[in-house]
């Protein structure tokens, strides 16, 4: 429940619905509790209506402890390739304990009495926790066999695809899925015709487009600011529901989701960039921190970095943003000038 209260969740949901990302399935653990209270005090909107209006398929699981129900919902979600799906799984926090349904169990601990009460409810009172070797091996073997079967199936399909691909396409695809892309910027021709007077945004745009022509997995987008930041890959098309071959992502005014999605792209083998005005980097700060934590190769491009180059007033004029970015561990911050 708490996750869906966050602004980033709505940004991402709106973005996914707009692109009709039919392979996206979200399982929502709806126990109607957060750390401080039950959601009847803080979160009374209709989540199903919100997601439906954003273009999502909404499915329900009445009993969250039913693996069968959950499995049926996932199977149904997979069949819909034209809409992302959210599965609302109704659960009871602290089920079986004395604090069942009480938000205090959210971050609290079970007492010994609670523990014993739950065991009585499950019919295992008096039995110590144990995991016998034989059933443990059976579970392990099932997982291994399932994975082996799926891998063999994938290899078979991929071998058929490879027959239709040239050697460069195979190399690019395999370097992407195995996250082993290598490139040498020293071999890139940066013979750029700089104007005598041009903004760094214009210079950066020229560099980005040269890199894009040399590094095929360099993709990214703006939070509705590309016409100003100029962080756009010319001639590379925009990604849309009808065309996922583009290299430009139109995030709309969704800075938080822009940063988070860029992290996901980096984890999937791409070299993404994310851009907006410097003052709005604050909206991306949680995602930037995660990039730094995980050593992800995300390039954040922030323009309009001075109070002197924005005609929109104080809301668009950065003051403390540069210092806060420089204070972040494992984040390289460059501010070129007078080149």
Model-found features: residue ranges?
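Glycine-rich ThDP/TPP pyrophosphate-binding loop and its adjacent helix/strand module
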Residues: 2-142, 327-339
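Intrinsically disordered, low-complexity segments enriched in small/flexible residues
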Residues: 1, 105, 192-196
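Thiamine diphosphate
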Residues: 137-144, 148-339
């Amino acid at each position: 429940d708490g996750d869906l209260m966050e602004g980033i969740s709505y940004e991402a949901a709106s973005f996914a619905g707009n692109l009709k990302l039919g392979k996206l399935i979200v399982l929502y653990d709806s126990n109607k509790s957060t750390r401080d209270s039950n959601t009847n005090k803080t979160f009374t909107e209709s989540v199903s209506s919100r997601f439906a209006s954003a273009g999502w398929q909404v499915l329900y699981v009445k009993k969250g402890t039913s693996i069968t129900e959950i499995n049926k919902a996932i199977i149904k979600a997979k069949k819909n390739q034209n809409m992302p799906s959210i599965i609302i799984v109704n659960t009871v926090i602290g089920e079986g304990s004395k604090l069942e349904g009480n938000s205090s169990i959210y971050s609290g601990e079970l007492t010994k009495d609670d523990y014993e009460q739950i065991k009585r409810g499950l019919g295992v009172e008096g039995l110590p926790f144990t995991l016998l070797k034989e059933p443990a091996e059976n579970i392990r073997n099932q997982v291994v066999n399932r994975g082996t079967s799926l891998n063999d199936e994938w290899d078979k399909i991929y071998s058929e695809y490879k027959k239709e691909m040239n050697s460069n396409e195979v190399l690019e695809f395999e370097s992407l899925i195995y996250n082993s892309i290598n490139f040498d910027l020293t071999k890139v021709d940066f013979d750029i015709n700089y104007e005598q007077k041009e903004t760094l945004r214009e210079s950066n745009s020229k560099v980005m487009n040269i890199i894009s022509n040399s590094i095929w997995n360099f993709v990214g987008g703006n939070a509705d600011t590309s016409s100003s930041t100029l962080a756009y890959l010319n001639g590379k098309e925009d990604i849309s529901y009808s065309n996922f071959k583009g290299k430009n992502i139109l995030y709309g005014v969704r800075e938080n989701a822009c940063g988070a999605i860029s992290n996901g792209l980096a984890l999937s083998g791409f070299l993404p960039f994310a851009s907006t005005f410097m003052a709005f980097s604050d909206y991306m700060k949680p995602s930037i921190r995660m990039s730094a934590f995980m050593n992800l190769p995300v390039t954040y491009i922030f323009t309009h970095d001075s109070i002197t180059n924005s005609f929109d007033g104080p809301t668009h004029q950065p003051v403390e943003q540069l210092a806060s970015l420089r204070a972040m561990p494992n984040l390289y911050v460059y501010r070129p000038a007078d080149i």
